[in-house]
Design a protein with these regions (language model features):
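Helical cap/lid subdomain of alpha/beta-hydrolase-fold lipid enzymes
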Residues: 1-172
Length: 172
């Protein structure tokens, strides 16, 4: 791979913790994906996503210069954000394998607007089970759909609580 191309794509494939990030709040985050990505609506949405021409050119060059290194579906095109949200996505599975650094405090705010027949609630896009992350110091369920979780008064109150706590702990 050309050195300039390697430098360009490296940040997309190699993740390093940022030492100045001390706290993370996940809001309606599908850590384990969403079944909607695998259903008709997700497939239709994925088909409408167009790669920028420069990304397609980079992808084509990498595949051409590394024959047999990619799964057939990745040889054809890069996965879309919808593809990555499929629960069995290899990329999503790899991301789940990354660990949050020990110096980072994590919180989850999870939408829970409905109960499914299987007993797992969710925000109509992300099931609660997908939004849960082991090791968070706080988890709040908000009675809101996915597109409204971020604006819900319970979310705003929880964010304010977390920010005040962070200020107290850091002495800022």
């Amino acid at each position: 791979m050309r050195p300039d191309l390697r430098r360009q794509v490296k940040p997309a494939y190699f993740f390093h913790p940022l030492p100045f990030v001390k706290r993370v709040v996940f809001i309606a985050t599908p850590h384990s994906g969403s079944m909607l990505a695998s259903l008709g609506v997700g497939r239709a949405a994925s088909l409408t996503v167009q790669q920028p021409p420069e990304m397609k050119a980079i992808h084509d060059e990498i595949v051409r210069d590394n024959p047999g290194s990619f799964r057939p579906d990745y040889e054809r095109s890069l996965p879309t954000t919808v593809d990555v949200l499929e629960p069995d996505s290899m990329i999503l599975q790899s991301l789940r394998g990354l660990r949050v650094p020990c110096w980072v405090t994590t919180h989850s705010i999870i939408g829970n607007a409905h109960q499914s027949p299987l007993g797992d609630g969710g925000d109509c896009i992300v099931p609660v089970s997908s939004a849960r992350l082991p090791g968070v110091v706080s988890e709040v369920l908000v009675p809101a759909k996915h597109t409204k979780v971020h604006h819900h008064p319970d979310t705003i109150a929880e964010l304010e609580r977390i920010l005040v706590q962070h200020l107290r702990e850091t002495g800022l």
